[in-house]
Amino acid sequence: MTSTWTNNGNTQNKPANNRVFIALLVVVFISPWPHGGELVWQYLLFSTCLFSLSTAYFINNISSINNDFVTLKSIRTPLILLSIWLLFQVLQVIPLPITLSNLAEQNLNTTHWQTISITPNVTLVELIKHTSYITVFILTLLLLNTKQRILTLAKTLFIGSAIIALYSLINHYSKGAFDLVSSIPPWTASWEKAAHGTFSYQNHYASFLTLTIPLGFGLIYSNINKNSNKEVGRSKLGKTLDLLMSTNGLYLLSLLVMIIALFKTASRGGNSIFVVSIVITFFCVLFQQNKPKKEKAKKTMLFVIGMLAVGIIVIFTGFTDSLTKRLASQGYNPNGRALMHQTALSIIQERPLVGTGAGTYPILQHKYKSPKLGNTAMSKRAHNDYLELLSNQGIIGFSLLGTATLLLLLKLFRGLKKSRRNNTGSLYGLQIASFCSVIAILLHSLADFNFHLPVNAVYFYLILAVGIKIPRLKK
């Protein structure tokens, strides 16, 4: 049987595509440093690079583009939904014969033309962002046609994050003596109070870490699986020494630095959701295994004991002091999030079907928010990506993106089982890691606006592409 992946791989491995892949690695490695693309000019520069790489890829493969897109057939439905989602945002910036003076009423009026978006220029910028996210998702799916490329991308994302974590800890303990990327107001927490990486907001950085930390475990699994046959007959001490002195030793050290950095963000949601995502991932993997109930119960018990042991060790080492101090003083107090959520709900009630335009929430929210929130810039976001999406794009936009995301998540979940059946071996750890990463940011977005930081959104789609592609590879 001839595989489309094999035929397509010959095309995609030519030198021109290798250069595109290397350039993509460079772009995603650098992208977290300038505030993760928080400022418009930063991300427009970043998105220009992504669009340029995509254009170069399609020019290089113009003769075989139809064969290339055959590889996307398995996720055709979510890609169609994502395309319609982008077209809906185009519709939001085009003048239409409708009357929206009363936000609750959307009537046809051929004598008065206006846009759905209350600020079309802002929505246009958001459209460019969202288009670049979907573009890099498709480009990554097309480029990841070999096991080596998948591993290389995972290593790039993980090592880049580890370097930022080291930078964060150095500044945390030196009180910002080596700060290269200052926070943008209103996010002005001191380094000793909260590590925030190269970002402004520590919760954004915490979400970034929960995306990239699981990749380290996947890479370690990959190396262990690859070297398992070479270590037959060796003593446990010898295997342990080899582990510590090998690439895996570097990965373990990097993971330690990254996990400590996560604690030092003092992000209650980020740390809690990270643990929850690990638990969810464990039970999803366990569910996919055809094992006796007793064996599953044994694994669950060992997992719980292991989690408790790690938690106790971490707490007693003092690495969680920033987090424990915040929890001691604030607990899980929502810090005004309930009022921010109510603000979003008020806007949704006014224009439920089509929304006010992508990216317009910060502009409109002051008319609806409670006086208790004051004029602080921190309340310009809903601190819930789902509510903000509903207010910006209404039921139509929310349904399109939500359905596409759920279908991709289902594909990722089913891939956990498919990877085991196809015996993709060393990549199975990365398959699990990608599922854990995706679950983490989706859950954290219930209490924050993580997808509004461009680098988090781009890394989400990169890791999602890794998880979707692994089950499709031949051994």
What do the predicted segments below correspond to?
Residues 58-72, 88-106, 111-115, 121, ...:
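Transmembrane alpha-helix boundary signature
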Residues 92, 201, 338-380, 386-389, ...:
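TM-adjacent membrane-interface loops and short helices in multi-pass inner/ER membrane proteins
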Residues 95-108, 122, 167-183, 196, ...:
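Aromatic-rich transmembrane-lumenal/periplasmic boundary elements in polytopic membrane proteins
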